[in-house]
Amino acid sequence: RFLIPIFLILHFSLNAIEYNLSWYPKDNYFDSINTPTNLKYSLINTDGVWEDNKGSYGVMNCLVSLLTKNSKETELNGLCQANDESKDEAKFWITLKRNSLETTGVGKITYIAVTGIYKKVIGMSCPYAVTYVQKTYAIIKQKCSVEFFNKLN
């Protein structure tokens, strides 16, 4: 009698998996304008491969703008298109937003347009963290809720 509720709790706990996506972009194009007042505006075109914990993978391309104040605080806005090479040629488009230090930081990804298996996550947002490697490479880790993960099933 007591085993059934315990089994159900364990079953749902074990199946409560967050969605994780890792992206490894490289900057292809970078241009910036600097002012004498330590204000810098930059445009970046970047792309790289991505993978998630559901076994999906593909290529993501982004256009990103950065406004940096006093050589530290950065306001980042980007628009990306990702192709899923593993699932019925699905695609998703996301926005990147971040206000943090130029060299590292935490921001928010929002799914603004989707096809295929991603249709149920349109409008959802997830936090992401970025770490830069050298000057042109990055590691971006996105972590989404269990609800997000379940909508991809």
Residue ranges and their predicted role:
Residues H11-S13:
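N-terminal signal peptide c-region/cleavage motif recognized by signal peptidases
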Residues A16-N153:
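Beta-strand-enriched cores of mature, soluble protein domains
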Residues R1-I6:
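Sec-dependent signal peptide recognition
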